[in-house]
A protein has these predicted regions:
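Conserved P-loop/Walker A NTP-binding site and adjacent catalytic elements of P-loop NTPases
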Residues: 2
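Exposed acidic/Ser/Thr-rich ligand/metal-binding surfaces
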Residues: 6-211
């Protein structure tokens, strides 16, 4: 067990206590096949080193660990929404990396419509008995479309019955909305992580089964 205390990067009046407990490792090859849809915020607020550039580097790490039986998709949202990468086998790493390299920040944040599109993409690539998960990567600054907390949570909660979970990955500071990220993950039967460095946490969350 390892503990660490540090100031919260989004509020210097708050402290974070990190408790790390090492459990039994489960070989990646033993995990069910994964259908991962990364819903990436590419709005203007993500255009800083600790946001989109860090996210892209983390995604490349994940792509390198994907197996041929795994599928990865990229959905982006800013003023509008786009499927930047259709469901692609983990064996096609160059194709995945090229799509990641093409991500650019700019525009406002239509997060709700992005969530809807991500669920459609996840359903199309659904793997029965596999890990079917949307990973929402954002600084939490939703400012276009459905912006009411309850509406967003209800939207995600309605979709969890489809067997597709939603986890959230928080990046950066400033407009970062920790409360919304935690509540969306809870509603989506997923987990929440704050990513401030190139850590394994993002990889573990993507590869884990269930919460």
């Amino acid at each position: 067990v390892h503990t660490e205390v540090a100031r919260a990067p989004w509020n210097d009046r708050r402290l974070l206590l990190r408790i790390a407990i090492k459990g039994a490792d489960k070989a990646v090859d033993a995990l069910p096949p994964a259908n991962l849809v990364f819903l990436v915020d590419v709005s203007g607020s993500m255009n800083s080193p600790d946001k989109l550039p860090l996210l892209k580097s983390s995604l490349k790490l994940l792509a390198d660990r994907m197996r041929p039986q795994d599928r990865i998709s990229l959905v982006t949202y800013a003023s509008g929404t786009t499927v930047a990468l259709e469901a692609t086998s983990g064996a096609e790493k160059a194709k995945v990396v090229n799509a990641i390299d093409g991500l650019r920040a700019g525009g406002s944040t239509a997060g709700a419509s992005g969530i809807e599109l991500a669920y459609r993409v996840a359903r199309q690539a659904f793997i029965p008995g596999g890990i079917n998960r949307i990973l929402l990567a954002t600084d939490g600054d939703f400012n276009v479309g459905v912006t009411d907390f309850r509406q967003l949570k209800d939207l995600v909660a309605q979709r969890r019955a489809s067997g597709i979970s939603l986890s959230t990955l928080g990046f950066g500071t400033g407009n970062y909305n920790e409360q919304l990220m935690e509540q969306l993950a809870d509603a989506g039967d997923g987990a929440y992580s704050y990513i401030d460095t190139l850590l394994e946490g993002m990889l573990r969350q993507a590869q884990s089964h269930g919460q």
